[in-house]
Amino acid sequence: MSSETISVSKLMNRKVQTDFEDQNIMSACNIMHANDIGSVIIVTRNEDRTPVGIITERDIVRVLGKLNPDLLNTPLKTLMSSPLITLEESASMTDASKLMNIKKIRRLVVVDRNNKMTGILTQNDIFRAIDKNPNLFSEFYGESFSSKFKEIYEKYNQYRLENLMPEFNKYRLED
């Protein structure tokens, strides 16, 4: 299995949290807090609820950093990151990762062929996929890095066994 064959639709979260572009930052903060997430997709109030932007934790920090109380009531449309960067759900994990790196973003809105939002893909989704499939690690980070990492990890485990475990065993309660 390679990152070229893993489609974005397999990794993305289909439960996208949204808010309307005329809402304020407190509304978006409440959604993020209630759902333990780092972003909210901003949509229009029309029937299609068209995604038009994204509010992220960084955007909120930027607003709060200005210490201007009026910004708390400013419509999200004014504060959101736009234009929204999207990727078709048939794209590969590699495509998604490259686009995130090029655009210097951590989240992508996933759309179908009709440009309708179907989910959201985050860097964490990609990291989870790599974690579940060790072969992807070397694909993303290079074979030499992977072998060096493995070597370091094995040495660390050996060090733990030789140095830390005997020390730990001194304090172990006898049965």
Report residues per predicted region.
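Tandem CBS (Bateman) regulatory domains
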Residues: M1-R14, T56-E88, S92-I102, R113, ...
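Short, flexible active-site loop motifs that bind/organize anionic cofactors or intermediates
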Residues: K15-T18, T50-P51, T86, K116
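A glycine-centered beta-loop-beta connector
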Residues: M32-N35, V40-D59, M100, L108-N124
